Amino acid sequence: MNYRRLTEDEILRLKSQSCLADDWGKVTVAEEFSTEFVHHTRFSGEVCLGVFHSEFMLPGGIRKHSGLRHVTLHNVTVGDNCCIENIQNYIANYEIGHDTFIENVDIILVDGVSKFGNGVEVSVLNETGGREVLINDKLSAHQAYILALYRHRPELIARMKEITDFYSNKHASAVGSIGNHVMILNTGSIKNVRIGDYCRICGTCRLYNGSINSNEVAPVHIGHGVICDDFIISTGSHVDDGAMLSRCFVGQACKLGHNYSASDSLFFSNCQGENGEACAIFAGPYTVTHHKSTLLIAGMFSFMNAGSGSNQSNHMYKLGPIHQGTLERGAKTTSDSYILWPARVGAFSLVMGRHVNHSDTSNLPFSYLIEQNNTTYLVPGVNLRSVGTIRDAQKWPKRDGRTDPNKLDYINYNLLSPYTVQKMFKGRETLQNLRHASGELSDIYSFHSAKIRNSALVKGIRFYEIAIHKFLGNSVIKRLEGIDFRSNEEIRARLKPDTAIGSGEWVDISGLIAPKSEIDALIDGIESGKVNRLKSINAEFEKMHSNYYTYEWTWAYEKLEEFYGIKPEGMTAEDVIHIVEKWKEAVVGLDRMVCEDAKKEFSLASMTGFGADGSRLEKELDFEQVRGDFESNPFVMAVLKHIEVKTALGDELIGRMQRVSEN
């Protein structure tokens, strides 16, 4: 924008409107500037003003014309059509965009050169330090995972810190920015904070040293009573109602409120925190805690629901709060659960009761951990048939609140993936070895300071086998869909993987599921200096995410021989039919188990408390009016439809394979 100096006439008019300046020569204005809407304003340092043409329509039908009233500006650029009034102290060292509304604020300033929260060290997982993550505007859950957990590679950590420092220094400035269409109302102190477009800050107490990365498609809302120090808040997030954050990163579309308190913590996409407390936690995508009595401390979580009163301890009153733990993706805690760190809980497991024996159940996913008389009992695989697990898997993609097209986290929602299925292979082998070592007639088996009952062990093996059948069958059907094969050779050619990437171990790096070989290749690239920018690291994660199904097939192809005893390179149509029959059996069997589990929610016991003051018939009628009946429940109907669709899908492939067999 071209600015001009004020005319003598304009200076006189401004003075008559109670305006002052240390040096009127340093006040420059837009070509069409009018003094009409500038009153009781003091200027110092270099000040640039835009035009004041438009009005703001406020709730209650009040109109306010853009302009400056009762404000002190020091080294400030004000864009077109802004309304700034009733600033108790001053605004210093800021560039303010157009159409921004700032009213009744204590002070807004940048003091010295600031990095606006970039480069702040967050002591995640270990309160005493050693796993610090340097936060930045482009931080993804996957970057943070590597930086926090791969400390056995010091060269990698040094390089990643270097990359973040480069970014932080590049964006450091002695001048802050407030974007376009921003609203800041009834707010206390804002110091060293960069504020993006379309942000709403209303009734906030204090913001110090941070970035609010709001934009038009994903605005950020900061609400009443909020206090944030040393922070970064990403697009589409809401921090409201007395939340207090200190040294925290808040990812995209997160919601923190109702007096939630967090320090040294990272919250990634779609996390929710209300009422409770977080300390040194790594909250991967969809970590949700709603209750006042819940403390999450020194743990790594993702796709997690914390029950009321869920607590952990990272302190054994010896060398300080030095312990940490992990609940792998999809793990949940019930009310009043407690875990003494260190411990590791397998994916999609449920934790009930108090667990103090440092169990590691990472190779037994989909389990229940239940405490009886201070002993941890493990029920392996049982969560595979839980209606809650299936409901969770369906709800997460629907609850993705990210509207920003530039997504920081690459989230894989699959319940069954090479990551979880490889653990089922290990879990099945572990359970078989336990049975072999202790004898088939043992009542109780011991595993990593946990106990497994005989019946639970036998069922666990069966659950894992059903899930493996389902996953491998899904992969084969997907690979062969939509093609009319004329010979076994054509089938084998189609089954052959497109790439060698995908074999071996897979990892879940906080939402992104990828082959370990690819993560290692990225790490080698960072160490060598080949990958040396934050955007390059994120581009590599995006590539892994977009190639997931290609890599997944490579892994599944190799597992066909291990599980079915069939060499894939010699596979025939009959072999495919055998796999699909097993798959149909697994899918339908699992869906029926899920339906049976859902049916418990419609039992007579579930009707307790319904039909107040009435007979049993009235109880049933009241229940039906409130909850509906089993047959018409949307979830149950979806499961029954799923059985129908999957059976038809399997039959269609079997039909194609039979035509090959007949040739």
Where are these regions (language model features)?
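Intrinsically disordered, low-structural-confidence terminal and linker regions
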Residues: 1-9
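Glycine-rich hexapeptide-repeat left-handed beta-helix
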Residues: 13-21, 29-52, 56-68, 77, ...
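Long, compositionally biased intrinsically disordered regions
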Residues: 111, 372-663
